[in-house]
Amino acid sequence: GAPQNGKRPVLLAARNAHKALLYAAALLDFDIQWLWPAPQDAGALCSCPVSAAKLTGALQGLAQQGKRPFGIYITSPDYLGGVQDIAALAEVCRDFGVPLLVDNAHGAYLRFLPQGGQHPIALGAAMCCDSGHKTLPVVTGGAYLHLGKNAPIQDEAAVRNALALFGSTSPSYLILQSLDKCNQVLSEGYPLRLLQCCGYLTRL
């Protein structure tokens, strides 16, 4: 986010965000306004549920301070498997003209459930990162970055240049090859196998 009227840019984020977000804030010099879980929320900090009403209130509060976040950062699924109502949050973000950024590290498989409608991009997120190595057959460290139709940046070259700032000029080709191999697996009947796996789990 670029400075706004000489002020540091602000990101609105659920408090259960991965520490990598803190590293990004330190490197890129932006502030984080936290969305904290309510005291009665089960799981509290690890789950940190954010409702559409809560997000609306937080955005209105920032607006009263003359602040407009450059993005909303939500972790879904969380570390306990809980899933946020991404569709409702995306609608709020559209109303306020702020992009929804989703850490979908633990939900790379969601695209391949019946109808594919559970993935954050399908639900309206502007940008989303999937850690393929967590729930797909990918070597540790392999991940995907997805851009929605409403992403603030649509220029693929610009996105690649931004990623290059944080990447190595000597990447692991084992990881890259595993991502390519995973793509092949995903295109060869993976949704059916995932559905069968879900069926097995329901019988446990």
Kindly give the residue locations of the regions a language model identified.
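Conserved PLP-enzyme active-site core in the AAT-like
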Residues: 1-204
